[in-house]
Amino acid sequence: YDIYHGYEGMNNIKTINDNAGIQPVKVDEEIIELLKLGIMMDEKTDGNMNIAMGSVLSIWHDYREAGSEDPDSAELPPMDELERAAEHTDIHNIVIDEEASTVYLTDPDMSLDVGSIGKGYAVQKVAEYAKNELGIQYMLFSVGGNVCAIGGHPDGSAWAVGIQNPEVESDQAYIKKVEVQDLSVVTSGNYQRYYTVDGKRYCHIINQDTLMPADNFSSVTII
């Protein structure tokens, strides 16, 4: 699901983006399934989870990287640049041919970014493999902010998962403990991938309506 690196002998999301407006790209069935999930989530969230936002997100990524490397020169991307990029985020321009196992972006200036769903999808696939192929009954594993529980603890109790305090400088490392069995605990917030401009923190979660980083909450956890 990498959008930044190509791999010899493998077509991935980057390959699809590189061929936008040029030609369909043959991909693995799991990439097809991931993109179908993304399209479904776009419909369910009225466009608030749009995997076709790559053109906007890449601008923020570049400014965030530059600002992190040189904080004194950190700046926000110009709104007109973001608005021009936002003209190329129509998810209906993703053409999936399941029979041929290809994906084609009809807009040459469009790009995909599956960061909102890619990690969760991969975690779910690992959990399914562990249960169905390896016969694992009890397991707790974490991939970044995604924690997945298979069954409960071997002693019969639930798994205990701590939710990180978004105020990272606080003496209290966790703000809450939740107990789960056969569930996932997914957390994202403004305290990991961000940069600071004029004393204000700008995170990696972008509001599609404003084209600006979301600032409603410091952290959100979904169980």
What feature does the model see in each segment?
Residues 1-223:
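Mature catalytic core of soluble alpha/beta enzymes
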